[in-house]
């Protein structure tokens, strides 16, 4: 049997997983700093649930992995974390609102494979239900900038409002039943250009006259400010969208993030579930051209699930861990899983105790040489694993109550008191922050 992975999946070896775990921890820490609560939902769902928001959207539906269980029920692997979250809120009416949750988990899409995009991947999501104000969007965008600062990645966020976009299309007499097709085409404008949009809408069955109107409208809007759209399009949806965008912009200015938040009147986020603000996050350096995060407001999904068709104001943001990993792996040296490597020289019993002492009294990550390798080979291992410090402990060291501390980066050695490993003064001899 040939050993290979399913197309679009990948094994992550320890040196890769270290960085992926760092990203996950950064997400968790940032999300919790904003008062978000953790949630976990099933990977396996009813197909009817997972296909709900994509009704009529064949481009999305064809990417859902489907299967049947032994009871002949139609099931699906979750395509994202948004619908499972909406299901949880709909099933638990006693959840206190506003409810801010985060979830980090695997999702599956049978779509094209490209840089940073696989068919099995991890999303890191935050959603807020119960807040009508675009202050929620501003906070999520602020959180995104904070997360990427933590990861030393410079990003911009493009944003728009679906009310504005839908109002523009309504004002140029695009039939309601064709709006989704046009939006899906406009969503690609930065990738395929205006000529590509024209070709795409024609392929979707839009008439040439309507295609020309769409393209001319796009060109006429490119230099408009947010406020200009009210005058350019006498439409109530446009007016509502402008009002929400202006309020959001005020919050972004107050937060000091408006400079890196860019209004894009044709950003669409193709999914039909969005009802207001939408946004996408991009790397400033363009090393990855696709978005590394996205989201928006969807006020109708939970009410539809609950069957009362009430408005449950909800807004979310999603970060792709895998694409962030790709960006970081291009610029960051993989760090070690251990801070200190202990090499016993005939002192295995004592070193076992010392390793346990350090783990139990400090936050140091400690690895002990277990394979009985000679000193040279053990040091070579520590060097290849990027472990910053090595403790060399032989019988001579124990007799003088000292140990040898080797700085692997500098190649220097110093003798430190054995007592420092027991009284928490070890950090005086190295540059590793120790939490007691």
Swiss-Prot record:
The EC number(s) this enzyme carries: 6.1.1.21
Enzymatic reactions: tRNA(His) + L-histidine + ATP = L-histidyl-tRNA(His) + AMP + diphosphate + H(+)
Compartments (UniProt record): Cytoplasm
Keyword flag NADP: no
Uppermost EC category: ligase
GO biological process: histidyl-tRNA aminoacylation
InterPro entries according to UniProt: aa-tRNA-synth_II, aa-tRNA-synth_II/BPL/LPL, Anticodon-bd, Anticodon-bd_dom_sf, His-tRNA-ligase, HisRS-like_core, HisRS/HisZ, HisRS_anticodon
Keywords, ordered alphabetically: Aminoacyl-tRNA synthetase, ATP-binding, Cytoplasm, Ligase, Nucleotide-binding, Protein biosynthesis
Keyword Cell wall biogenesis/degradation: no
Single GO term (MF): transferase activity
A GO CC term attached to the entry: cytoplasm
Pfam families the record matches: HGTP_anticodon, tRNA-synt_His
Family: Belongs to the class-II aminoacyl-tRNA synthetase family.
Quaternary data: Homodimer.
Descriptive protein name: Histidine--tRNA ligase 1
């Amino acid at each position: 049997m040939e050993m290979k992975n399913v197309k679009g999946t990948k094994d992550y070896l320890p040196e890769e997983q270290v960085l992926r775990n760092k990203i996950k921890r950064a997400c968790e820490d940032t999300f919790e700093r904003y008062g978000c609560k953790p949630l976990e939902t099933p990977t396996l769902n009813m197909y009817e649930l997972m296909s709900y928001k994509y009704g009529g959207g064949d481009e999305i539906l064809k990417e859902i992995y489907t299967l049947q269980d032994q009871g002949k029920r139609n099931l699906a692997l979750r395509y994202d974390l948004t619908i499972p979250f909406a299901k949880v809120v709909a099933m638990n009416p006693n959840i206190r609102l506003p409810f801010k949750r985060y979830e980090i988990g695997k999702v599956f899409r049978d779509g094209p494979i490209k840089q940073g995009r696989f068919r099995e991947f991890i999303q890191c999501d935050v959603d807020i239900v119960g807040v009508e104000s675009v202050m929620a969007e501003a906070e999520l965008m602020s959180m995104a900038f904070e997360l990427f600062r933590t990861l030393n990645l410079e990003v911009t966020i493009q944003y728009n409002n679906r009310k504005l976009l839908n109002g523009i299309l309504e004002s140029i007499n695009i039939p309601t039943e064709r709006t989704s097709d046009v939006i899906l085409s406009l969503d690609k404008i930065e990738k395929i250009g205006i000529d590509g949009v024209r070709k795409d809408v024609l392929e979707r069955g839009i008439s040439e006259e309507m295609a020309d109107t769409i393209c001319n409208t796009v060109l006429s809007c490119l230099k408009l400010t947010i406020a200009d759209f009210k005058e350019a399009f006498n439409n109530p949806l446009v007016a509502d969208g402008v009002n929400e965008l202006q309020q959001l912009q005020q919050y972004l200015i107050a937060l000091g993030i408006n400079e890196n938040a860019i209004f894009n009147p044709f950003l669409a986020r193709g999914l039909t579930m969005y009802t207001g603000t939408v946004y996408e996050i991009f790397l400033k350096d363009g090393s990855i051209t696709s978005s590394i995060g996205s989201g928006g407001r969807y006020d109708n999904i939970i009410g539809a699930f609950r069957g009362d068709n009430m408005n449950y104001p909800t807004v979310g943001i999603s970060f792709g861990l895998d694409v962030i990993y790709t960006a970081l792996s291009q610029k960051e040296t993989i760090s070690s899983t251990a801070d200190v490597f202990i090499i016993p020289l005939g002192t295995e019993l004592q070193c076992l105790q010392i390793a346990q002492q350090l783990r139990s009294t400090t936050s140091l990550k400690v690895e002990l040489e277990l394979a009985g390798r000679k000193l040279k080979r053990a040091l070579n291992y520590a060097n290849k694993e990027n472990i910053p410090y090595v403790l060399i402990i032989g019988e001579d060291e124990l007799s003088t109550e000292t140990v040898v501390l080797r700085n692997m980066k500098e190649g220097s050695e110093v003798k430190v008191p054995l007592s420092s490993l027991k009284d928490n003064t070890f950090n005086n001899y190295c540059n590793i922050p120790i939490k007691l």
